[in-house]
Swiss-Prot record:
It catalyses: ATP = 3',5'-cyclic AMP + diphosphate. It comes from Escherichia coli (strain K12). It is found in: Cytoplasm. Belongs to the adenylyl cyclase class-1 family. This is Adenylate cyclase. GO terms for biological process: cAMP biosynthetic process. The keyword Cytoplasm applies.
């Protein structure tokens, strides 16, 4: 037994050293420096070293002895900077070991690969010590980033996997969806930089079911010493639920980096195919280690993963995805075999052997090696192929779930995040801009883009067509358009967000008189200036929550501009009554079309189009409907206006209107419902009513309808009887009515059950509400607020409302006789009757 264990230790150490050497080979000096010094920086803690912070920061790695490179670094600090290095105290040190995991040291490591580092620590560290160690690791990440090396640290309690603890979707080890599978990946890819050897490798595969008992036997026999080994536990049996959750997580990752994740996704699919008796890849590698079969290029974990996936796809005769996964593997290795190299490294030798076995020709190699120059056609083809593969994996996963009657163990929150990200990335919806280049090609820019409009009645469907060439008849006719949409806004957004349209692109347009080149260039400049191409991926918190508009552009008069009719005409209007929504003698709306372009908190990009004189109303209702009442305000709201005339005025007015409506929408509360906004459009008045759950729009023909709508919204749901014809008014009201102003009369009911309202408009038309149970003060406040805002911001034609100050009265009895007094928040009995000389303004209280 002793000799067997010693032989295993020697094999382990040899393979570990091979992996360390491979990790450093062909990498730049910065990577080599970071990779070599990380153990030293974690073992020691000194102000002259990167990662230093005040406090009792845990330091010291068990069994650590500096190598030659690390000793040279320490000597330089002592010699040139006067640093006195003090070794941590003897005994069990807080850090059990430092390990890389993932593609590092495998054939899958490339010059752009990052480093995932597990810092395993003793379980006796308290929460403050763990926080300090985490902060130090964050500082070391920043130090590495300053050298151009991406490093991610993960603190791992040595008992984490024994206690079935899980991370969350915020990190690389993410999700309640992974536990044993995460340990499987660690065991097959880990490279020990410093600290204890990994105990799991010493337990034969046929003893896996009795892992703890076997380990205790080794300790009891004195074959192994407990404090020399990192023990994260055995690879117990896997549940179907864990496969399901882990596969969903891999699909989540594959959205942003499909070439990188497709191989892992298919490995999990292979595991599920073998369920309930899967052969975990880590166990396979360990078995070969114990048997002395150092195959697959030194038990390279990446090559062995490809080998297992190949075995699975061949067994189910899925040669389409097998070809795809081989291409993904080739691109991940990033060795361009079609180009001669003076030095043939081990990774190039491995890839050459595999490509020879696959029977690839030079043309295929050249095509793959030219990936950096792939343009939209190749990228879209690759995107569709990757999407098909991912959806096939998803369908197989669903079959697996049904076959095993799964009750998914992943937390509902995690599953919700995964599902929402899949939806945001892949769901095709009208107006949604599909992003086709998730790290497939670095540059999709086009030197020429042509937008062509086809009017109704032609052979081709009406709308806009986009071509990636200059408008040469021969070239246009002989090529399919890149994209089609009924509206120009969607095409410009698609070209911009997919990277085809850049500052260097020459633009051409055949707009059939609808849009000319200067207008197109202005729009492109506005969109590119206000919408950055790349944003951080949506956080799990954002995906937990309803999507919210983050960046919004309102594009006015792009495709239809009413002010174009002013050309060579004399237009009469009064600057004192200038209203862009109801302009001039004919009260024309100067907003003819509205396009919306917005990005939401899930990083979806959406477009919408509205046309005609009601386009502003429709666009407003749509924008506000997409903002739930508890949403955060958009980070930015921009108005792009492309009118030939009065551009600045229209843009300013639309900006004011949209900003005010957004504020009203997001500030409505349960305690203060019934806010409203009136808007005069083309001689007609519309009311926008802001309730907690929605925003409604109502056309208001006259003053009675208008104020009735306000009253209805304030008293909604109460017992209200309305009369409009043959109304018998109280004599005191009938005698008090006066044309030219709006009058509200409040009357207490005889049974003291609520109150009545009599509304007379400027023409003395009457509407009556009986037995109202709402608040008179709120009604007065809202009508007064409406008057104030309307007077400040709108100009209305004389045919609508004169907008003399609405008057509010209370009908009271004084000495047994009904009289009218001005309404106060607290009506005062026995107040002198109201002055009926309407040339003298009535005293009125405003509520703001």
């Amino acid at each position: 037994m002793y000799l067997y264990i010693e032989t295993l230790k020697q094999r382990l150490d040899a393979i570990n050293q091979l992996r360390v050497d491979r990790a450093l080979a062909a990498m730049g000096p910065a990577f080599q420096q970071v990779y070599s010094l990380l153990p030293t920086l974690l073992h020691y803690h000194h102000p002259l070293m990167p990662g230093y912070l005040d406090g009792n920061v845990p330091k010291g790695i068990c069994l650590y002895t500096p190598d030659e490179t690390q000793r040279h670094y320490l000597n330089e600090l002592e010699l040139y900077r006067g640093m006195s290095v003090q070794d941590p105290p003897k005994g069990e040190l807080p850090i059990t070991g430092v390990y890389t995991m993932g593609s590092t040291s495998s054939v899958g490591q490339s010059c752009s690969s990052d480093l995932d580092i597990w810092v395993c620590h003793q379980s006796w560290l308290d929460s403050e010590e763990r926080q300090l160690l985490q902060r130090k690791c964050s500082l070391l990440e920043n130090w590495a980033a300053s050298l151009g090396v991406e490093v991610s640290f993960f603190l791992i309690d040595e008992n984490r996997f024994r206690h079935n603890e899980s991370g969350s979707l915020g990190g690389e080890d993410c999700g309640s969806t992974q536990h044993i599978l995460l340990l499987d990946e660690f065991y097959r890819t880990a490279v020990r930089l410093a600290g204890k050897r990994i105990l799991w490798n010493m337990v034969p595969c046929d003893e896996e079911e009795h892992y703890d008992d076997y380990v205790m036997t080794l300790y009891a026999q004195g074959v192994l010493t407990p404090n020399e080994w990192l023990d994260l536990g055995g690879l117990s049996s896997l549940s179907a639920e864990e496969y399901f959750g882990a596969s969903l997580w891999q699909l989540y990752k594959s959205i942003d980096s499909p070439y990188k994740a497709v191989l892992k996704t298919l490995l999990l699919e292979a595991y599920s195919w073998e369920y309930p008796n899967p052969r975990l890849l880590a166990k396979d590698i360990k078995q070969r280690l114990h048997d002395g079969e150092i195959v697959s290029f030194g038990l390279d974990p990446y090559c062995m993963m490809l080998e297992r996936v190949t075995e699975y796809l061949t067994a189910i005769e899925d040669f389409t995805r097998l070809d795809l996964v081989r291409r993904c593997f080739y691109l991940k290795v990033c060795e361009k075999l079609s180009r001669e190299r003076a030095c043939v490294g081990w990774r190039r030798a491995v890839l050459s052997q595999l490509v020879s076995e696959w029977g690839w020709d030079e043309a295929r190699l050249a095509m793959l090696d030219n990936r950096a120059n792939w343009k939209i056609d190749q990228v879209r083809e690759a995107h569709n192929e990757l999407l098909d593969a991912m959806m096939q994996s998803y369908r197989n996963l669903i079959r697996f779930a049904r076959r095993n009657n799964l009750s998914v163990s992943a937390s509902p929150q995690d599953i919700g995040v995964l599902t929402r990200k899949l939806y945001a990335a892949f769901e095709a919806l009208p107006g949604k801009v599909t992003l086709v280049n998730p790290q497939i090609s670095p540059d999709l820019s086009e030197p020429n883009l042509t937008f062509i409009y086809v009017p109704p009645g032609r052979a081709n469907r009406s709308g806009w067509y986009l071509y990636n060439r200059a408008p040469n008849i021969e070239s246009i006719i002989s090529h399919q358009p890149l994209e089609y949409n009924r509206y120009l806004n969607k095409l410009v957004a698609w070209a911009w967000f997919n990277g085809l349209l850049t500052s260097r692109t020459r633009l051409y347009i055949k707009g059939n008189g609808i849009v000319d080149l200067p207008k197109l260039q202005e729009m492109v400049a506005d969109v590119s200036h206000h919408f950055p191409l790349r944003l951080p991926a949506p956080t799990p918190k954002a995906l937990y929550s309803p999507c919210e508009i983050r960046h919004l552009a309102i594009i006015v008069n792009l495709e239809y501009d009413p002010t174009a009719a002013f050309r060579n005409q004399v237009v009469h209007f009064d600057f004192r009554k200038l209203d862009v929504f109801s302009f001039g003698e004919n009260q024309n709306c100067l907003v003819g079309s509205v396009d919306l372009l917005y990005r939401n908190s899930w990083n979806e990009v959406r477009t919408l189009h509205f046309n005609g004189e009601q386009s502003m109303i429709e666009a407003l209702k749509t924008i506000l409907g997409k903002m739930h009442q508890d949403a955060a305000p958009p980070d930015s709201v921009e108005v792009f206006c492309y009118s030939q005339h009065l551009r600045g005025l229209i843009r300013t007015r639309v900006q004011q209107l949209v900003s005010e409506c957004i504020e009203l929408r997001l500030s409505s509360t349960r305690q203060e419902t019934g806010r409203f906004k009136a808007l005069r459009v083309s001689g007609q008045t519309w009311g926008l009513f802001f309730e907690r759950l929605n925003v409604s729009v109502q056309k208001l023909e006259n003053a009675i309808e208008f104020y009735g709508a306000i009253s209805h919204n304030k008293l909604h749901g109460l017992s209200v009887q309305v009369e409009t014809n043959h109304v018998k008014l109280p004599a005191v009201v009938d005698g008090f009515a006066s044309e030219g102003i709006i009058q509200f009369f409040f009357e207490e009911t005889q049974d003291e059950n609520g109150f009545n309202i009599y509304i007379l408009d400027e023409s003395n038309r009457v509407e009556v509400y009986h037995h109202c149970e709402g608040s008179k003060e709120e009604l007065v406040r809202d009508v007064s607020r409406f008057y104030s805002s309307s007077h400040d911001r709108f100009t209305y034609g004389s045919s609508f409302i004169n907008f003399n100050l609405p008057q509010f009265y209370q009908i009271v009895k004084v000495d047994g006789r009904e009289q009218v007094i001005p309404f106060r928040t607290k009506s005062i009995g026995n107040m002198p009757p109201a002055n009926q000389d309407h040339d003298t303004p009535l005293l009125q209280q405003y509520f703001s």
